[in-house]
Amino acid sequence: MGLSRVRAVFFDLDNTLIDTAGASRRGMLEVIKLLQSKYHYKEEAEIICDKVQVKLSKECFHPYNTCITDLRTSHWEEAIQETKGGAANRKLAEECYFLWKSTRLQHMTLAEDVKAMLTELRKEVRLLLLTNGDRQTQREKIEACACQSYFDAVVVGGEQREEKPAPSIFYYCCNLLGVQPGDCVMVGDTLETDIQGGLNAGLKATVWINKNGIVPLKSSPVPHYMVSSVLELPALLQSIDCKVSMST
């Protein structure tokens, strides 16, 4: 790590600042209720949602070939057909997809203590939101949780030539804020993108948010720091700056 003070912090969005996984689970529960009450599905409702969850986790999205709405509606259509058999039911798939999506967005909120932390941090350093993913999906989340006003800049991977962990997107972020990689800290919950990307770009430090106490694989990227909550960040940044003061 360099001997300059931290001048900028890059934050991941999903499962770092907002509980995307929890919001997604709530969306799935609403779909299960719909399938059971309106369409009289029984255990098939949960099986369908489990199948969709697997499809989402393996999703490969190419914006030049299709739109995210079509792709994700197809996940539901395939899951329903795989579970129930018979002809494809696009109309039901659309109903499930839009209920899941709207419920999910309703529950994507910035907690009050996270808002307070960002507000205080921004008095000391520049803040940038750096999120991977499809442009439409991520912009809808950003609008739903009303987080844009807490940042000096917002960068969505799906709008750039490359996403995390490519160094180029980190250099782009540095240029936006007028800082050097050695001035910046990356904070995120995903070792393979947030942490590896920060390491690839030569950032001052990487901070892994490990809410569930996961033991990483030996082959995983090694973060400079690990915390269980993003709310631990202000104290950690102070400690990083103290090390700089003692070294200079």
From Swiss-Prot:
Hydrolase listed as a keyword: yes
Annotated GO CC locations: cytosol
Highest taxon in the source lineage: Eukaryota
Reactions this protein catalyses: N-acetylneuraminate 9-phosphate + H2O = N-acetylneuraminate + phosphate; N-glycoloylneuraminate 9-phosphate + H2O = N-glycoloylneuraminate + phosphate
UniProt cofactor(s): Mg(2+)
Entry binding sites for phosphate: 13-14, 131-132, 164
Keywords: Carbohydrate metabolism, Hydrolase, Magnesium
Pfam families: Hydrolase
Biochemical pathway: Amino-sugar metabolism; N-acetylneuraminate biosynthesis
Enzyme class: hydrolase
GO MF annotations in UniProt: N-acylneuraminate-9-phosphatase activity
Family annotation (InterPro entries): HAD-like_hydrolase (IPR051400), HAD-like_sf (IPR036412), HAD-SF_hydro_IA (IPR006439), HAD-SF_hydro_IA_CTE7 (IPR011950), HAD_sf (IPR023214)
Ways its activity is controlled: Inhibited by calcium. Inhibited by vanadate, sodium orthovanadate and phosphonate.
EC nos: 3.1.3.29
Protein residues bound to Mg(2+): 12, 14, 189
Biological process according to GO: CMP-N-acetylneuraminate biosynthetic process; glycosylation; N-acetylglucosamine biosynthetic process; N-acetylneuraminate biosynthetic process
Family, per entry: Belongs to the HAD-like hydrolase superfamily. NANP family.
Primary role: Catalyzes the dephosphorylation of N-acylneuraminate 9-phosphate (Neu5Ac-9-P) to N-acetylneuraminic acid (Neu5Ac or sialic acid). Can also use N-glycoloylneuraminate 9-phosphate as substrate.
Name listed for the protein in its UniProt record: N-acylneuraminate-9-phosphatase
Lineage, top ranks: Eukaryota, Metazoa, Chordata, Craniata, Vertebrata
